């Protein structure tokens, strides 16, 4: 179960990207066992359903600089919604030396990666994927895409 064990690094590997190499770490267990500094200095973007299900377990992250709770559906993964997310982060004093921490599946990963690649001309991000597809697609592949108008996944980035 996601929130029951410690969070050891069980394996890692390097990816060679056209934007430069980066390391992928695989971890299992309790995401709240991440180092406290990372949790409390990050602006967290989390899937609403995940937060609803594990509300008690996620209490420690409620004191992060900002917590942006998003319902993981296609309408929220759109260019029209980006100003809402950017305004939230700016209002909560996002700085270039801080990072975005995404907790959720592919939609949350896409939103967070797209924001991280574009806000303040690019900031650091960290993913905690909760689905296998999100792990392989947006996390290891470091790609994100959002919808614009009637076009699905038309705007995107590769952000190692």
Question: Locations of the language-model features?
Answer:
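ATP/NTP phosphate-donor binding region
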Residues: 1-99
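Hydrophobic aliphatic residue packing
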Residues: 15, 24, 107-108, 140, ...
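Glycine-rich nucleotide phosphate-binding loop and flanking beta-alpha elements
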Residues: 51-52, 107-109, 134
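Short glycine-/acidic-enriched loop or helix-start segments at secondary-structure transitions
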Residues: 54-56, 111-113, 137
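Short, basic, helix/turn surface patches
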Residues: 96-103, 152-158
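Glycine/serine-rich anion-binding loops at beta->alpha junctions
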Residues: 98-117
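A glycine/threonine-rich phosphate-anchoring loop and its flanking beta-alpha core
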Residues: 114-160
